[in-house]
Design a protein with these regions (language model features):
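Transmembrane helix-loop-helix hairpins at the membrane interface
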Residues: 7-167
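Short, small-residue-biased leader/transition segments that mark boundaries at the very start
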Residues: 1-2
Length: 169
């Protein structure tokens, strides 16, 4: 069955794709930009912007317009906050892989970048507002949840603090 094959293909290749993005943006670039600017906020915002611009060529932008770049930039910011507050990339790696896996397996549309034989298919006329909903409401709730679950402290220093060469990002 095609869905069985899709499940295993997605299970193998989507974590590779999302891990590559996370290692490049939240690993390599965030650390390199942090060393260059000697602070944490510049790499957080620059890598978020770069992450958004990487997705500029996705068909969702063509369908819904450049307003959708807000979604991608703020998703990058969300992943960056998870990485800095948790002192590691595990949460952003898992969330990114889970998000793309869900889109691939559970629901997709003719106008999305992941053209798969998913369980559900959206056939309605898309609205940018429904795609922006997660970044303005769901992501902040997830950050709040993780902050309580993992007892995140020292937000100001972790997100906006100075970097010295003996500190890690």
């Amino acid at each position: 069955c095609i869905r069985d094959r899709l499940f295993f293909i997605s299970l193998i290749f989507l974590p590779i794709q999302t891990s590559w993005e996370e290692y490049v943006f939240r690993g390599y670039l965030m650390q390199g930009i942090g060393i260059l600017f000697k602070n944490r906020w510049t790499p957080l915002f620059l890598t978020s912007l770069m992450f958004g611009l990487l997705h500029y060529w996705n068909p969702e932008i063509t369908k819904l317009g450049s307003i959708l770049l807000i979604h991608y930039v703020l998703t990058g910011l969300f992943f960056g906050i998870l990485t800095l507050m948790d002192d590691g990339m595990e949460l952003s790696l898992g969330f990114h892989a889970g998000n793309n896996f869900m889109i691939s397996i559970l629901v997709t549309a003719d106008w999305t970048v992941l053209q798969t034989d998913s369980i559900l298919k959206s056939v309605g006329d898309p609205k940018a507002g429904s795609i922006l909903l997660p970044v303005f409401f769901i992501y902040p709730l997830i950050i709040l949840y993780f902050s309580k679950k993992y007892n995140w402290k020292d937000w100001n220093n972790k997100l906006f603090g100075k970097i010295s060469l003996d500190n890690k990002i």
